[in-house]
Amino acid sequence: MKKCCSSKAFTMVELMVSIFVTIMIIASFYKLYNDSVRTERASSIRVAVDIMGEQILNTIAESIRMTGLNNTLEDYLVDTTGGTVGVIRYAGEQRFIYLSPFGSPITKVVSSTGDFPNCEFTLFNSAAFNLGVNKLYFHNQDSFFKTSSMSVGSYSDAGVVVETSGFTSGNYSGLACKSVFPAGSLVTGEDFIYTLEYTQASGNSLKLSYQKESDATQKGVLVDFSYNPDKSNSYSMPKFVLEYLIETCDNAGNCSTGWTTPKGGNKLTDDEIKGIIAVRFGFVLLSKKDRVYKGDENPADMPKYCIFSDKNSTENYYCYQLQSFNYTASVFRRVVYLSNYRFLKEQAHR
């Protein structure tokens, strides 16, 4: 009997080819997926490092920028040799001590009533107001005036209301407070003594600590970065550089500036401290988080990461050479000009 139709089946060769093609497609998709995961992970690590570095930079820079805002010419002129007085009290290779109202209320006058020195002020709200704020500095076009007695602030939608019953200076007795301190006048809180310090021993650490100038019990730490090689830390800071831009003038009034780093554990002299017009700092931040690269590594082939590369820089001092490709390295730097401190300097030389 003759069959009405015929059927075909895969030959062994066709079956092997189809299996091979299927495996190749799966492998390609797996490789694509694996590469995308690695790229995303590397990008996430880089973003995390950048965020951490920028937070450290911004916190330090903002505290330095306000140096001298609450200070007088007399504060500037005192001898800072002992490291316990003055606006800038210590300027070394890896340590910097200075006064700044950063962390205190920084706000403005909304309105005022009464006659000087007994004034009632409505101020713009500030997140820094708290029960520990017992002195404020009110600034006008002539100078600034520190309260000798003031009430605890009361809060409303209109702002913070404080009452003063005296200032430590000012000869405006009897004048209307609104004419002495018109709307928009700057108001600042008390100074804190800030200490920026980098140490590099068995590990490395960078700290920015503060202490209220009038009350040593009010203190804390704003930046506390530390690395211990004996523990599974993901981040380290093997290099930190701190420099000071110093302006010097001769008797004819000709001035020049230059960046200075007091190396070898030394510090700036009192005259050099009084000539500071800017501070710059930077660091190299390493991350070994999720790094799995292994291989032969020649130290001479490792890249260098330089914090500052201007003509006055010495390469070995300002640069860090990567020790292993198992780390992701990032460089952070910032220049901060001390406008308020320089204003005091200019007053001293008039």
Can you annotate each of these PLM segments?
Residues 92-97, 205-207, 278-279:
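Short, hydrophobic/aromatic-rich segments at coil-to-beta transitions
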Residues 35-39, 55-79, 103, 142-148, ...:
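Alpha-helix exit/C-cap motif
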Residues 8-61, 65, 347-349:
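Aliphatic-rich helix starts adjacent to a transmembrane/signal segment
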Residues 42, 46, 64-95, 255, ...:
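Short, glycine/small-hydrophobic-rich surface segments
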Residues 77, 86, 102, 186-191, ...:
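Short linear sequence signals and composition-biased patches located at protein termini or domain-edge surfaces
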Residues 1-5:
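N-terminal secretory signal peptides that target proteins for export/translocation
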Residues 82-181:
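Autoprocessing Asn-cyclization modules and mimics
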Residues 166-195, 199, 203, 210:
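Cys-His-centered catalytic/binding microenvironment captured across papain-like cysteine peptidases
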